[in-house]
Amino acid sequence: MTSKRPGGSSFQPEVKRKRESDEFEQCYVSRFENELPSVPTIDKTGWARPAVDKDLGISKSIACQILEVETYHEDGSATSYDRTNVKLYGVTKSGNSICVIVTDYFPHFYFQAPQGFGVEHIGTAQSAICNMVAAAKRRGGSGQAQLPGKVVDNLVHVEIVHGENLYYFRGADTKVPFVKVSGSTEALHKARMELKNGVNLMGKGPVNVGNLYESNINVIVMFLAKTNIVGCGWIEIPAGKCRILSNSEKSSRCQIEVTVPVKNLIVHESDGEWAGIAPIRTLSLDIECIGRRGVFPEAIKDPIIQIANLVKIEGEAEPFVRNCFVLGTCAPVVGSNIIQCVNEKVLLEKWAEFVREVDPDIITGYNILNFDLPYILDRAKVLSLPQVSHLGRQKEKGSVVRDAAISSKQMGSRVNKSIDIHGRIIFDVLQVVLRDYKLRSYTLNSVSYQFLSEQKEDVEHNIIPDLQRGDEQTRRRLAQYCLKDAYLPLRLLDKLMSIINYIEMARVTGVPMNFLLTKGQQIKILSMMLRRCKQNNFFLPVIEANSGDGEGYEGATVIDPIRGFYNEPIATLDFASLYPSIMIAHNLCYTTLLKSPQGVENEDYIRTPSGQYFATKSKRRGLLPEILEDILAARKRAKNDMKNEKDEFKRMVYNGRQLALKISANSVYGFTGATVGKLPCLEISQSVTAFGRKMIDMTKLEVERIYKKGALDGKCPADAKVIYGDTDSVMVKFGVETVAQAMEIGLDAAKEVSKIFTPPIKLEFEKVYSPYLLINKKRYAGLYFTKPDVHDKMDCKGLETVRRDNCPLVAKVLGVCLEKLLIERDQQSALDFAKRTISDLLCNKIDISLLIISKELTKSGDKYQAKQAHVELAARMKKRDAGSAPRLGDRVPYVFVAAAKNVPAYERAEDPTFVLQNNIPLDTKHYLTNQLAKPLARIFEPILGDRAEKILVEGEHTRVRTVVQSKVGGLAAFTTKSATCLGCKSVLPRAESENAVCKHCEPKLPTIFASRMNTMHELENHFGRLWTECQNCAKTMQDKVNCSARDCPIYYMREKVRNELSEASAVIERFGDPCFQAPTK
C-alpha cells in the first residue's frame, strides 16, 4: 500500500535528502542555537584606537595625514544660502582618527569678461546669474521656491580676476579680465547650464559668455589645488584655530571632529619630518557563504557563515588583530580569536560593530569590491539589518553599492562595483594587481605564488556546505581557509609595497588615493597642471570631448634590425627620460604653442620636425617643462635620500616616491596625446615623437661617424655599426671581444654623442648584451651586463617567455633554449632540447598544466564579432554546471582537444579538468603547429637559417605519436569496448570477457599480475606524494585534501594520477582472488 504521507514515494530517500538540504540552507539556525546556549562575550582588547590627548586643538596644534576627501552639499534656508562643505578624513601622529570640516570653500569656474565689462558691472552680473540659478532651482522642484531676496542674491558670488587661456602664446604679458563665478556645487551646475543661453551681465541685454574655463574640473581636485593640500599629505591646525565638536555635535564616528576655515590650515610639504606615514590601520577581510548545490552563492538566498578579519598598522610586521566570526561552534585556531555566533543576523551585527570599533582607514581583501562587500551589504538588506550597512565614518550614512563601468587602455573595459564607505578607502588587491601587473592568471592562489612563492588551499564553493554541516573541527578548517584568504592580501600589499607606492603617487600628483584606485591616468597630470596654472594665473578651457576617431600621428622610430646571433658584446646607449627631456629642452607646452611663427626663428620661436611652432624660453618658460623639471629634480632627491637612509621602512617610502615621480614624468607626454581627454594637444605629442625620431637617427649617424676603425687611440678594432634602434635606445656593435672593452667605448660614446643635443637631453650608457640574439623589431634576448665580470640577468623583450597569449609550455621551452644558447652557449644542446620537447608533446608526455591557455571573459558571446574559444567553452560549462562555470571578469582556462578535420578551434577548446576526468585526447598537432613551432623557429632562424622550422617540426623525433582513447564524444557513445588480454592484447571471446588473460597467456599470469601490481604501487606512491604535498600546502596533515586550485600544476597531476590509479585498480580486479597455481615443471 502506497503511503499518502509527504515524501512517501518510492524516491523517498532522495526527496528526504533534498528536503534536509534545503532546510539546512534556508533555515538551519536551530541546530547551532542548541550548540550555543549563550553567546560568548567578545574580547575587544586592543581593537580601539589610542585615547585622544585632551589638549589637542586647545593648547596643542593638530597635525594629521589626510587620507580621504569628501564634499557634501548643504541646502540653504530662509536665513542661509547653499554651501559645499569639504570633509578631510585622516590620522594624527598618535593614531587618532580625525575629520576636518572646511566650511568656507566655494567651487568656481571662469569665463572671459565681455568687451567693456568692468567692476561697475559686478553687481548687475551677480544679480542676473543668481536669479537664473534661483529660477532653475524652482523649475527643478527643489522646495526652495520662495527664497528671500538676500538668499537669492548670494547663491553665487561674482568677481573679476586677471589671467589668460592656457592654450597658445599671445605675448609676454597678455593677462586679460575673466569673470570668476563661485558658489555651491549645485548652484554652479545650474549656472553653467543657464549661461549657455546668454545672460544680462551689464544690464544691456543677454550676452553670450562663450567658452567656460575649469567648469569640468572635479570639485575635490579643485579644492586641493587651491589649498595646496596633496593626497596623503600632512596638514596642521594651530592651537585655538578650530572649533572642536562635542560627541553630540559630531556627524562622524571619528575620535576628533573639528570645523576650520581654509585660512587656518597649514599645509606641509612631504619632505623631512613630514615625509613619514601616520599609523594607518588596514583591515583585510574575507567571507565564506554557503550556496545551494550547483549554484554559485547568491546574496538574496544564501547566508554568510564566516567573516575573517586581520588588522595591521602600516609599517608594522604583523597584524595586531586576527579574528573570525563563525556561524556555529568552531574549534580554536592558534593565534586567532574565534567569535562564535548563534545565527547570521548576530554574525553580521557583531562584525559591523567590530568594524566601527576597530575604525580602519583602509579596507582591503581580494575581490572585495565585486564580491565580499556587496554580498555583505546585500545580505544586510535581505535580513533587514540597516545598521550593518553603516560601515563608514559618517553616522547617518550607510554604504551604497553601484555599478561603475570603467574603460582604459591599461585595464580594458570592465564593470566594477562602486561602494561608498565614507571616510575609508577600499583598496582591493585584485584591482591593484589587474592595474599594475600583466599575469597569466589573477586568482589569489596564482598571484600569491607569483609574488610570494606561496600557495593556498582553494576550496570549491560546492564543498563549503559539507564543511559547515560537519562538526567544530570541519568548521575550524573552514575558518583557517577563510583567515588565510584574509592574510594573503596583507602579505601581497607588503611585498608589492602597494599602499606606500599609492601614498607617494597621491603626494606627487596631489589627488586623493581613492582617485588613483578608481579613476584613469589623466586625473594625475590634470591635477599637477591645475596647481601650476593657479600659481601663474592660467585658466584651463573646457574642451568638448570627441569620439576619439581623430587623426593619429607618427610614433617613435625603429631602426631596422640587422638580425642575427651576436657572440660579440653589443653596447646599448639609452636616452635618459627621453620624452620629458625633449619637452624641457625645446620648451614644448600649451602656453608656448604658436598658431603661426612670430619673430626670428631659433631666437623667438622654433619649428619642430613635425612642423609646429613654439616660443623659445627667452619669450616664456612653459608650464609643462617647469613641472617636468621639478619632478625630475624631486626624483633625484628621493633617490639620494633613499641611498643615505638607514631605516628600512623609510627607504621603502623613498623608493615608492621616486617610482611615483618617474611614472608621473613619463605620463605627461601621453596626457597631451589623449584625444579623449581634458586637455588634448596633438601639436605637443606630435613634436615630441618627431624630435625622438630625429635624435635616434642623429645618434646612429654620429656613432658610426666617430667610432671608425682605429678611433679612440686604437681601441676601436673595427667600424662601429648600429644594429638596432628603438624609441629611446640604440644597440651598437663596436667589434670588440670583451664586455669590459664594450663598456669603455660605450661610456665614451654616450659622453661624446650627448654634446650634439640640447640639455637636459642626455645619452647614458648602462648595459652590454653578450651574447645577443636579435630576432626582429621589438624582439630580442641577451645576457644583460652592467659590470664586466658577471651578467645580471637574461633579458628578453617581445618573446613568448614574457607574453601571456601562449600556453606555459612555450615560455618554458623558449626559456630553457635561450639559457642553453646564451648562458651555456651550446647551440646543439638547445636544438636537442627543443626536439625532445616536441617528441614528448606528440607522445602525450607533457603535463596538461603546461598546455593551458587562459583568457578573460569580458563580455557575453553575442557581443563578440567572431566566436572565441574561451567564450564558447564558458557557455558549454554553464550548461554542465552553472554554479562552477566562469562568470564575466573571470579568466577561462582551456586546452585544445583532438577532433575531426576542419572543426574550428573554438569548438575544440575544453575545460582541462573535464579533459582529465574523461581521458579526452589533446590536439598535440595543434599545439605544435600553432603554439610551439613559430616561436622556436624565430629563435633558431639566426642560427639555422630559413630551414629552422622544418628542422624542428619534421624528422625522426616527430614520427612516434601516442593516441589516447576518449571516454566521451566522437564514436565513444556508439561503440562497445571489448575486453582484451592483459598479456598479448588480443580480444577475448565474449564467454571469457571477465578473465584477465587469454588461454595462451595463462602460464604467464603470475608475472603479468606482478607487473600490474607494481604499476599500481608506483601510482599509489606517486599519488601519496602529491597528496602529502597538498596537505603540507593546506597545513592539514591528517585531513582530506579539498583543494581544487586550477592554477596549480599539482592539482592537475593529482587528478591525472587519480584517474590512472582508478584504471589500474579496475585492471587488478579482473584478476580476481590472487591465488595462482605455480607452473608445472
From Swiss-Prot:
Lineage: Eukaryota, Metazoa, Ecdysozoa, Nematoda, Chromadorea
Keywords, alphabetical: 4Fe-4S, DNA replication, DNA-binding, DNA-directed DNA polymerase, Exonuclease, Hydrolase, Iron, Iron-sulfur, Metal-binding, Nuclease, Nucleotidyltransferase, Nucleus, Transferase, Zinc, Zinc-finger
Family: Belongs to the DNA polymerase type-B family.
Descriptive protein name: DNA polymerase delta catalytic subunit
Region of interest (Disordered), residue spans: 1-22
Motif (CysB motif): 1030-1048
One Gene Ontology MF term: zinc ion binding
Annotated positions binding [4Fe-4S] cluster: C1030, C1033, C1043, C1048
Subcellular location: Nucleus
Pfam families for this protein: DNA_pol_B (PF00136), DNA_pol_B_exo1 (PF03104), POL3_N (PF24055), zf-C4pol (PF14260)
Domains as described in the record: The CysB motif binds 1 4Fe-4S cluster and is required for the formation of polymerase complexes.
Membrane-spanning ranges: none
Enzyme Commission (EC) number: 2.7.7.7
Co-factor binding details: Binds 1 [4Fe-4S] cluster.
GO cellular component: delta DNA polymerase complex
GO biological process: base-excision repair, gap-filling; DNA replication proofreading; DNA-templated DNA replication; nucleotide-excision repair, DNA gap filling
Names of the cofactor(s): [4Fe-4S] cluster
Catalysed conversion reaction: DNA(n) + a 2'-deoxyribonucleoside 5'-triphosphate = DNA(n+1) + diphosphate
Database matches in NCBIfam families: pol2
Native species: Caenorhabditis elegans
Zinc finger (CysA-type): 981-1001
Function in brief: Possesses two enzymatic activities: DNA synthesis (polymerase) and an exonucleolytic activity that degrades single stranded DNA in the 3'- to 5'-direction. Required with its accessory proteins (proliferating cell nuclear antigen (PCNA) and replication factor C (RFC) or activator 1) for leading strand synthesis. Also involved in completing Okazaki fragments initiated by the DNA polymerase alpha/primase complex.
Binding positions for Zn(2+) per the UniProt entry: C981, C984, C998, C1001
Domain of life of the native organism: Eukaryota
Keyword Iron-sulfur attributed: yes
